Design a protein with these regions (language model features):
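Register position in tetratricopeptide repeats
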Residues: 373, 407-408, 441-442, 475
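A conserved beta-strand-loop-helix scaffold within acyl/acetyltransferase catalytic domains
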Residues: 2-85, 128-148, 154-295
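TPR alpha-solenoid repeat register
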Residues: 397, 431, 465, 498-499
Length: 520
């Protein structure tokens, strides 16, 4: 198989038709792998992502047969840089996985695994992967125990014992009464009674969000949800609210959200957000919230029953409760599927060869710069050096590493970074200024003079350049020239005089010439 790597939204946009064709052909595909949902999600997440795309051979006219969406996260910790490869949908999707034509899976999935194995990462998080056992074996067989530690992630919530690796779902017939007949007598009677109570009464009503009401209905839902879970998720609540609001809003505008609200008079007492996937004809219950002070009929059961009835009327074939085996879900006639969560780690616990993936460079630079600002110089230095191992002429890493080295007194090493920087960015005045400063710190005044003159040439209106040149000339015993330059600067014709000083290049004497030869 030939594998391409898709890394930009425009490239992904061009693949929409190809993606949808593969998605439609794949019985294992689900909404979190749909082009609409994934494109929206990838447009919003920080950090690099990429999609492995497989085709039979390297032919521009040949469509892809499989896609594997992934993302990269990098951390500077324990005196090194560690990269994690994660499933692209993690932190927003209940399910992750691979989209693949069934006839291509035996070639495409092992090819994906081989490509991932060759990348520079310390940990591979195969988290919340909804995939058949057959495909799971094809994927994981390329990561043998001799080379990788494999750790199964425990998805059982300790507080209440809910197992988030178990995912209940109800298969929907084409008739509402047929669905009810498959439930227990008690549940069937309860659902009929509750829906009748709501629909035959002026006291209660259910509305479904429209373009005009969606924002208000969503805020109602999120407010209820926050009240319920704030104490338990306090440290993450604000980010979860922001993420859920953004994802559901994007998805609604793509036609992927169904949001009914249950009302008692003019008081909203519960709301439920479901992701709908017309291509696969599935409803996927995402989140709910209710007014905990409401003492009327059970709002959760009413909204689920209402949603399932509507899904059947629309011709949908599955109502998925997503992750978590909460007992109430099974009263709706559910089966369950199990998803996989495993972390694969290199035996060394580090990136192979200690190198970072080039896609991580912006993240590593940001983290290293923040560590540098906080005074954590050792970790910051590691970050800068890892960048330069991959991209030796990275201007920002050269500059910041040079500054860090100079600050800790390693002027010779700092000089090497700034000298490279002046070749990478010869038009950057700051690079010449920094090079001049470290040369001064090394006592190499003739060389410092040359760098400072170049700084003056690039920034003629900056007094710092004139001061630096004057200091070097004074150190070299050329006070007469400094005095002449000062007099020229205050004469009416000072502009041309300063230009003469700026363009002047001293001829090094024998001692400074030798010094320059040693320091180069």
């Amino acid at each position: 198989m030939h594998i391409d790597i898709i890394e930009t939204l425009p490239s992904l946009a061009r693949l929409e038709d190809n993606w949808n064709a593969v998605y439609d052909a794949d019985d294992e595909a689900q909404i979190f792998l749909s082009w609409k949902w994934l494109h929206g999600w990838l447009s919003s997440i920080p950090g690099p992502w990429f999609i492995l795309a497989a085709k039979e051979r390297d032919d521009a006219d040949l469509p892809y047969a499989a896609f594997f969406p992934l993302r990269l996260q990098t951390m500077i910790e324990k005196s090194d840089v560690f990269s994690d490869v994660r499933m692209a949908g993690n932190f927003g999707a209940d399910y992750t996985g691979i989209v693949c034509r069934p006839e291509a899976e035996h070639k495409a999935i092992p090819a994906f695994a081989r490509i991932v194995r060759q990348m520079n990462w310390a940990r591979l998080h195969l988290d919340n992967v909804r995939i058949s056992e057959r495909r799971w074996r094809l994927l994981t067989a390329c990561f043998p125990k001799a080379s990788f530690h494999s750790t199964k992630v425990d998805k059982i919530i300790k507080v209440d014992g809910i197992d988030n690796s178990l995912c209940p779902y109800a298969t929907l017939p084409n008739d509402w009464n047929a669905y009810l007949d498959a439930l227990s007598t008690n549940t069937r009677q309860k659902i009929r009674r509750l829906l009748k109570q709501v629909e035959s009464s002026s006291e209660y009503r259910i509305t479904v969000a429209t373009a005009e009401t969606f924002d208000r209905n969503l805020e109602t839902l999120l407010g209820f949800w926050e009240t319920k879970w704030r104490a338990r998720k306090s440290d993450r609540m604000d980010s979860l609210i922001r993420s859920n609001r953004a994802m559901l809003t994007r998805s609604f505008h793509s036609g992927l959200v169904y949001l009914p609200t249950f009302w008692h008079g003019d008081r909203p007492v519960a709301a439920l957000a479901t992701l709908i996937e017309p291509r696969k004809r599935t409803f996927s219950f995402y989140m709910t919230g209710r007014d905990e002070t409401f003492e009327g009929p059970p709002a959760g059961m009413i909204l689920h029953a209402y949603s399932i009835r509507d899904a059947i009327a629309r011709g949908f074939v599955e109502y998925d409760f997503l992750r978590g085996n909460e007992p109430y879900k099974y009263s709706f006639g559910c089966k369950e599927r199990r998803i996989h969560s495993v972390v694969l780690e290199t035996r060394s616990g580090r990136n192979p060869g200690g190198r970072i993936d080039h896609r991580c460079i912006p993240d590593v630079l940001q983290q290293a710069t923040e560590l540098h600002r906080k005074g954590q110089s050792a970790d910051a230095e590691i970050g800068y050096r890892r960048i330069l191992e991959v991209e030796p002429k990275h201007a920002d890493a050269l500059h910041r590493l040079g500054q860090l080295l100079a600050a800790k007194g390693d002027f010779a090493a700092a000089k090497r970074q700034f000298r490279i920087l002046t070749t990478v960015r010869p038009d950057a005045a700051k690079a010449w200024q920094c090079l001049g400063q470290v040369c001064e710190s090394l006592g190499q005044y003739e060389e410092a003079l040359r760098q400072n003159l170049e700084f003056m040439r690039l920034q003629p209106n900056q007094p710092d350049g004139f001061v630096a040149v004057a200091k070097c000339m004074a150190k070299l015993g050329r006070m007469a020239e400094v005095n002449a330059a000062l007099l020229a600067a205050i004469e009416p014709a000072s502009v041309s005089s300063v230009r003469k000083r700026r363009d002047w290049r001293p001829t090094p004497d024998r001692q400074t010439a030798g010094e320059h030869a040693v320091s180069a």
